[in-house]
């Protein structure tokens, strides 16, 4: 089980606090000038296809030594072992945390309550394989005998964000099937998705473990109504709907053949579920073999994370550097900036992955924390972000550590597009690290023939302080395997930080209160009676809503 250790009471935390008195004055230009081997010391490779450069961070070897000591004193290694061995580290829900078992390609036994879960995992994978191959090959026919051409995945949260992100990221591997994802309970989402589709050639995946999730089931019933308006016979539902669920009774009552129900387990958290049957949409989007490659890539990182000493462990290093900024430099957010359009949902995916996991204010003892926990995660693909928010990163008053991610080889070699993209990738981290001094600005103005008055007026606005920290993650090419590597790397980074912060990273009680209140409010919206049961603001909003609808 996880130990309950307040990180701020460790000797390592005290040492880091003292070290920060000097470290807050670190200057990246000076650090690089003082050490010609800095890149070699502060970069790591993962396999043959990923390079992680963390040299442009406000760290020294002494900083990292003290951060590793913090990991040791909060017993990170035993926590890693506890997770992989199936201990119920999700204590508030009494569950193991075993998304790693879903991609356990070495097939070593993983025990939960005395039972090896791997036979069940492999059985579901085999079932997914058969289903996927029948649909992609065209063997599976709709109710009029036509092949299925379009798949609509209906889910929300982890049942949507992961599959959607991966399907987009691996679009170069697309099968003949067209994928669509519906999540929002706003009717516009399902209506606009269905407009161009043909009920005869559309199959729906309903992704809800309990088959009771409000948003998902609302959309599922609307999808069934749309289908039956054309198909007529309720019996045809079985050829056009499948379920990713464990509630066989509700699935059957909906009209879905339980042979087309794919189960997963309570030790699979929603935001880690793309590796499970929830990933069926991924397998349909890119083919089952590529889905397995995705699992293989994640498993490679799992082995690295579980077996590598902390000092050479890439997810651990990334986690500790992030913690350094979050807890000592006072950074409130991190930006994930993929220079690959296919990865346009990567930041959004880990916005959920990180903020739902580590957005906690109570420690594992049930006490309020008096230190910062999870950061705000955000980002957009490059180079779009450069023309949107990089201004603040470069010259604003907030410290925002950034992860830059890019492939060396593009799937679309069009002219010199990729060279231009990558020139920006390299330039941004250089600019953020080293900036532009007043002397350089003055020299540029002088070379451009500016007058002294013009120079004096404009120089302050043209100076870049630099010293903005970044990680650069260079991938040979975005493939199913390297994407699996990347996702698992970030997953384990989140886990490491949660362990050190002494919080539970695998529950999400913060999403419950809003749902409870929404269920109370919903019946109040059914008529035009004035509502008085809430605070004055909520009453006023509900009554204004009713007035607008009248």
Swiss-Prot record:
Main location: cytoplasm
GO cellular component: cytosol
Alphabetically ordered keywords of this record: Cytoplasm, Gluconeogenesis, Glycolysis, Isomerase
Subcellular location(s) of the protein: Cytoplasm
SUPFAM superfamilies the record matches: SIS domain (SSF53697)
Residue positions of the active site: 356, 387, 515
Documented EC number(s): 5.3.1.9
GO MF annotation list: carbohydrate derivative binding; glucose-6-phosphate isomerase activity; monosaccharide binding
Protein's GO biological process: gluconeogenesis; glucose 6-phosphate metabolic process; glycolytic process
InterPro entries to which the protein is assigned, alphabetical: G6P_Isomerase, G6P_Isomerase_C, Phosphoglucose_isomerase_CS, SIS_dom_sf, SIS_PGI_1, SIS_PGI_2
Positions of disulphide bridges: none
PROSITE patterns on file: P_GLUCOSE_ISOMERASE_1, P_GLUCOSE_ISOMERASE_2, P_GLUCOSE_ISOMERASE_3
Metabolic or biological pathway, per its Swiss-Prot or TrEMBL entry: Carbohydrate biosynthesis; gluconeogenesis; Carbohydrate degradation; glycolysis; D-glyceraldehyde 3-phosphate and glycerone phosphate from D-glucose: step 2/4
Catalytic function, reaction form: alpha-D-glucose 6-phosphate = beta-D-fructose 6-phosphate
Protein family: Belongs to the GPI family.
Job of this protein: Catalyzes the reversible isomerization of glucose-6-phosphate to fructose-6-phosphate.
PANTHER family xrefs: GLUCOSE-6-PHOSPHATE ISOMERASE
Protein name per its UniProtKB record: Glucose-6-phosphate isomerase
Organism: Aliivibrio fischeri (strain ATCC 700601 / ES114) (Vibrio fischeri)
